[in-house]
Amino acid sequence: MTNRYTTLFANLEKRNEGAFIPFVTIGDPNKALSFEIIDTLVSSGADALELGIPFSDHLADGPTIQEANIRALESGITPKDCFDILTKIRAKYPHIPIGLLLYANLVYANGIENFYQKCLDAGVDSILIADVPAHESKEFRDIAKKVGIAQIFIAPPDASESTLKQISKLGSGYTYLLSRVGVTGTETAANMPVEDVLAKLREYNAPKPVLGFGISKPEQVQQAIKAGAAGAISGSATVKIIQNNISNKQKMLNELTYFVKEMKAATLN
């Protein structure tokens, strides 16, 4: 279950590196190209993957990721197609941790246990349900434990100590630390006074904290690692490269390669 995350973070620590984790929506802009995009992210040096399953209801996403959802849905992508892509990625890359970032409606629509089981069968390691805070997560957590999937929780920068304690106790895999409150995306740059939150998470022995929201530049990755995060997630900036190169596949894949290499290089201490 969380073993791929445990192994990854242990190996990175030995090498004095942080994790760079790109996010994309599965099926954006279509099924065939989506596999190539995810394949490119891994072969360019991504340490783990955070992936979305397209759904029409995405509350915490900024416009860039909403548009990725729309592109994928308009191309006719189905949840079955998404699981096909996940299965192919897992077969090609047996060791990389794969996480899904979703909303509760999508999980409910498929039946919680059935959905988690499908994820496990496709090679998924973790699930983060963006609109389910830790204190409301029992039904998901129990099934995650039973099935063998890590349940990831979001630690907001304005979280109380008791919330951070709860997240530390209940989460597994890693902790998704928000660098700011609001919707995702590079439209608002990440602000970084997160050292205090990171210190608390360490004190409570939380799963490794990874900073996300508004991470689009190598120096933000460096700052995150310097502040004590185990890695950084970049969603909107990655998706923007897809959006800006829809009509030029080779340029898109080249730019994604360059972006991942540059962001990964920033995790080296």
Swiss-Prot record:
Domain of life assignment: Bacteria
Gene Ontology MF: a single term: tryptophan synthase activity
Catalytic residues (UniProt): E50 (proton acceptor), D61 (proton acceptor)
A Pfam family hit: Trp_syntA
Alphabetic keyword roster: Amino-acid biosynthesis, Aromatic amino acid biosynthesis, Lyase, Tryptophan biosynthesis
InterPro entries: Aldolase_TIM (IPR013785), RibuloseP-bd_barrel (IPR011060), Trp_synthase_suA (IPR002028)
Gene Ontology CC terms, in alphabetical order: cytosol
CDD domains registered for this protein in UniProt: Tryptophan_synthase_alpha
EC code(s) of this entry: 4.2.1.20
Principal EC category: lyase
Catalysed conversion reaction: (1S,2R)-1-C-(indol-3-yl)glycerol 3-phosphate + L-serine = D-glyceraldehyde 3-phosphate + L-tryptophan + H2O
Pathway(s) annotated for this protein in UniProt: Amino-acid biosynthesis; L-tryptophan biosynthesis; L-tryptophan from chorismate: step 5/5
Assembly and oligomerization: Tetramer of two alpha and two beta chains.
Function: The alpha subunit is responsible for the aldol cleavage of indoleglycerol phosphate to indole and glyceraldehyde 3-phosphate.
Family statement drawn from the similarity comment of this UniProt entry: Belongs to the TrpA family.
Protein name: Tryptophan synthase alpha chain
Gene symbol of the encoding locus: trpA
